[in-house]
């Protein structure tokens, strides 16, 4: 029997009692396991979020009232990147003249011909489109765009509030590569 205050023969030799080192490691691993699991879950969530916002959706804040009444200044938009935009869709795109993000509505695609008459009438392929816009569509003063415009694979975009909009009447056809996505959801920030 060992006397109090004296080291046992096992501890004098420097070797711990059988299994104590393994037991301490195992206990430490069990103690750290929830933290490691949480870190792995957070890393997976961060990777998923990065992939989602890189390849699937785009978030955009609407600036100005060019798309009024559909969108208002300050609305937060979710745009879906994987869908091909069609006539009538509201889209987020990068403006060819400034590179800024903007929102407008697709009125013509691919090889359509767009004409805006001096009286404020929009014609696509010589027909009046079925859009529910309340504002007259007039050419923008000072624009270098001449009508009719024949598209070469891109899209022609107009804002819903045609008197305030800075759209394809200013910078012409927008290449499809500049389309960032179709607006699929709107969060209204006003009145919150």
Regions from the language model: what does each represent?
Residues 2-33, 55, 61, 69-192:
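Soluble "head" domains of membrane/secretory-pathway proteins
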Residues 37-55:
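Hydrophobic membrane-insertion alpha-helices, especially the h-region
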């Amino acid at each position: 029997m060992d006397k109090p205050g004296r080291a046992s023969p096992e501890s004098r030799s420097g070797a711990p009692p059988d299994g104590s080192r393994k037991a301490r490691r195992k206990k430490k691993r069990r103690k750290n396991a929830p933290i490691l699991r949480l870190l792995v879950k957070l890393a997976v969530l961060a990777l998923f979020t990065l992939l989602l916002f890189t390849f699937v959706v785009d978030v955009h804040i609407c600036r100005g009232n060019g798309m009024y009444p559909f969108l208002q200044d300050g609305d937060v938009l979710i745009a879906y990147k994987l869908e091909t935009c069609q006539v009538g869709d509201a889209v987020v795109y990068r403006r060819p003249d400034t590179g800024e993000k903007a929102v407008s509505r697709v009125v013509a695609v691919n090889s359509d011909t767009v004409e805006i008459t001096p009286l404020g009438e929009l014609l696509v392929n010589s027909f009046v489109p079925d859009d529910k816009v309340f504002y007259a569509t007039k050419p923008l003063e000072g624009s270098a765009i001449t009508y009719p415009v024949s598209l070469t694979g891109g899209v022609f975009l107009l804002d819903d509030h045609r008197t305030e909009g800075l759209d394809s009447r200013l910078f012409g056809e927008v290449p499809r590569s500049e389309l960032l996505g179709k607006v699929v959801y709107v969060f209204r920030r006003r009145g919150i």
